[in-house]
């Protein structure tokens, strides 16, 4: 049985073919298909070819049907290996999952980031997320006093 295919086009103009049913894991794409906003080519201008290709790889692996059986343990192992990427790629995948409204990929990426910062000090977290500290030493001390339990 032949399945309907659609094309996704990245910000650089590279196109990727994917089964429509698989692409529907991304609610943004599903809504575009249902609203007939596409002529079988969907522009995904907010992401590079590299990131779009990773999203498609994830969707293909997570598409469940009789032809693609995968145990939960195998999928969990695959997910862990899939997320073994540098920080900027993980952030880009998180943004892509959010934009495309792919809840399972967003959860996986978010959990990966959470695991990366687990146990970090506030200073380490600011460095990790490239956030400037705009608190005075007095404000920091007040926060530490008010939330003493969190710093023990």
From Swiss-Prot:
Tissues of expression: Restricted to siliques.
Keywords: Nucleus, Ubl conjugation pathway
SUPFAM superfamilies attached to this UniProt entry: POZ domain (SSF54695), Skp1 dimerisation domain-like (SSF81382)
One CC-aspect GO term: SCF ubiquitin ligase complex
Domain of life: Eukaryota
Leader peptide range in chain numbering: none
UniProt pathway: Protein modification; protein ubiquitination
Keyword Nucleus: yes
One GO BP: auxin-activated signaling pathway
Region of interest (Interaction with the F-box domain of F-box proteins), residue spans: 94-152
One Pfam family linked to the record: Skp1_POZ
Keyword Iron-sulfur (UniProt): no
Locations listed in the record: Nucleus
Classification via InterPro entries: SKP1, SKP1-like, SKP1-like_dim_sf, SKP1/BTB/POZ_sf, Skp1_comp_dimer, Skp1_comp_POZ
Assembly: Part of a SCF (SKP1-cullin-F-box) protein ligase complex.
Family, per entry: Belongs to the SKP1 family.
Function comment: Involved in ubiquitination and subsequent proteasomal degradation of target proteins. Together with CUL1, RBX1 and a F-box protein, it forms a SCF E3 ubiquitin ligase complex. The functional specificity of this complex depends on the type of F-box protein. In the SCF complex, it serves as an adapter that links the F-box protein to CUL1.
Protein name: SKP1-like protein 8
């Amino acid at each position: 049985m032949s399945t309907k295919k659609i094309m996704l086009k990245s910000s650089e103009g590279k196109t990727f073919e994917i089964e429509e049913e698989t692409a529907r894991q991304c609610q943004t794409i599903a809504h575009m298909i249902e609203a007939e906003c596409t002529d079988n080519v969907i522009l995904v201008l907010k992401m590079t070819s590299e990131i779009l290709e990773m999203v498609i790889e994830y969707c293909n692996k997570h598409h469940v049907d009789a032809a693609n059986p995968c145990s939960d343990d195998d999928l969990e192992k695959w997910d862990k290996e899939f997320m073994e990427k540098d920080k900027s790629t993980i952030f880009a995948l998180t943004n892509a999952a959010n934009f495309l409204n792919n809840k399972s990929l967003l959860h996986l990426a978010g959990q990966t980031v959470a695991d990366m910062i687990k146990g970090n000090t506030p200073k380490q977290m600011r460095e990790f997320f490239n956030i400037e500290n705009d608190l005075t030493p007095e404000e920091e001390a007040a926060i530490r006093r008010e939330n003493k339990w969190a710093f023990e």
